[in-house]
Amino acid sequence: MKLNNDGTATNQEHYKKAAMQPIEVMQRLFTKEQFLGFLMGNYIKYEMRKDYKNSQEQDENKARQYAYWYTLAKQDIYIEPVKHTVPKEFIFEGLF
């Protein structure tokens, strides 16, 4: 079954082939501050480029994903990309 490609890690087949996704490896290798900075940096990247690409909706989804993961990591919750999908009610304005 082919999933709808919303641009997030939850449905990217190339990530599912590995035992761990890159985000999980980084979580284990980085300090908490480094990891939070990585998540925040990716949020900013996708927010800034979304209006200049053909895949605006995908970049918006990716930005939401990184913002949501940021809130989890800040609470010391281990991110499992397939499990931790962004809830529809998640609000990330003023997050940082």
What are these regions (language model features)?
Residues 1-96:
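Intrinsically disordered, low-complexity regulatory regions
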